[in-house]
């Protein structure tokens, strides 16, 4: 569009890699006449690039080899995108909530890069479930009430509405929020919504799943006592002592543990590792209900990656599994406290 009038206009040019004019940049006495109309020597470019590539003074900065690589890289991208099948469309969901003093850095472009080449976005914008410009802090009780209601309402208005009315039924989820809210998002998605959940890695800093081959040994420990008061400690991102749980629930609590040999915050690297963790979560839900009964109280103490928290909520079956209460660690509150 014209920047002044916003009217539609054609701003494209055909540029030559090897100039057809003897006075042009990168002119080659042998190649230029042969390749004057050859597609391998032509580039479709904008006005700015056309002027740049045709500037004789910039010829050393833009030799033929560089332009050929730029042309090939772009053509490879176009070939990749046009080869994607229609059933590979996906709705991008972005959900962020304030964590302590930090807001959630979620960007549509970063999400798109993580999708390709397996899926590509349905629209040029995402389904946003975040509460914008929230002044509440996660140490405030009001924070949890407001964030939970906002998440449920926006999920119903946008995600549930899309599932009921759109032909595309796949979702790609990018979320950064306190773990109780991530688990809640997972319970809303459940397995009713076909979805891929993405993890923000620290090193390298990317949403792309990595091709890690290392298998994770998920360790499950059952409680020494059989109690109707049950805690599930998920110590994957960090270690969590039993005392931090019994100080909240009491010494008569049966504590189940899901952990790994060396908990740390960047262990989850691949889809396969997340798939195995889902299976572990599902088995533990079944075992807790079987060993403690349907009338047991279940309390969740999570320390896990964001994708794991969402998947934990997804595998929970509201009609079959025990209802649970989720706790969050906060120094301002003196440790774990009840949230949702």
Can you describe what each PLM-predicted range is?
Residues 213-283:
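Redox- and metal-dependent alpha/beta enzyme cores, enriched for Fe-S-associated oxidoreductases
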Residues 50, 172-183, 235-241, 299-310:
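Gly/Ser/Thr-rich loops at beta-strand to alpha-helix junctions
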Residues 151-163, 273-294, 308:
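A short, acidic, amphipathic alpha-helical segment used as a generic capping/interface helix at domain edges
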Residues 166-206, 309:
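Hydrophobic, ordered structural segments
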Residues 2-43, 53-64, 68-70:
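Histidine-centered nuclease catalytic patch
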Residues 287-340:
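C-terminal functional regions that serve as terminal interaction/effector modules
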């Amino acid at each position: 569009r014209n920047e002044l009038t916003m009217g539609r206009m054609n701003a494209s040019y055909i540029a030559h890699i090897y100039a057809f004019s003897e006075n042009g940049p990168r002119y080659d006495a042998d190649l230029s006449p042969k390749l004057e109309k050859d597609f391998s020597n032509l580039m479709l470019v904008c006005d700015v690039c056309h002027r740049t590539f045709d500037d004789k003074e910039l010829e050393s900065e833009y030799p033929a080899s560089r332009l050929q690589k730029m042309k090939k890289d772009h053509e490879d991208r176009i070939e990749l995108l046009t080869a994607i099948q229609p059933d590979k469309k996906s709705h991008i969901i972005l959900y962020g909530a304030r964590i302590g003093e930090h807001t959630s850095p979620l960007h549509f472009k970063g999400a798109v890069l993580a999708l390709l080449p397996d899926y590509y976005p349905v629209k040029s914008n995402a389904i946003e479930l975040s509460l914008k410009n929230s002044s509440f802090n996660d140490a405030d009780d009001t924070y949890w009430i407001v964030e939970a209601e906002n998440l449920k309402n926006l999920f119903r208005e946008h995600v549930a509405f899309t599932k009921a009315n759109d032909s595309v039924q796949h979702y790609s989820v990018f979320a950064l929020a306190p773990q109780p809210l991530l688990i809640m998002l997972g319970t809303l998605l459940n397995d009713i919504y076909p979805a891929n959940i993405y993890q923000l890695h620290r090193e390298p800093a990317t949403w792309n799943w990595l091709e890690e081959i290392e298998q994770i040994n998920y360790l499950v420990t059952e409680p020494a006592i059989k109690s109707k008061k049950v805690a599930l400690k998920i110590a994957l991102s960090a270690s969590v002592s039993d005392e931090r749980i019994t100080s909240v629930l009491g010494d008569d609590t049966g504590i189940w543990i899901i952990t790994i040999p060396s908990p740390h915050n960047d262990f989850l690297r691949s889809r396969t590792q997340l798939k195995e963790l889902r299976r572990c979560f599902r088995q533990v839900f079944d075992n807790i209900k079987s060993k403690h009964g349907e009338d047991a109280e279940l309390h969740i103490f999570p320390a896990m990656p964001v994708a794991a928290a969402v998947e934990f909520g997804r595998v929970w079956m509201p009609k079959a599994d025990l209802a649970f209460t989720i706790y969050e660690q906060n120094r301002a509150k003196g440790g774990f406290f009840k949230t949702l």
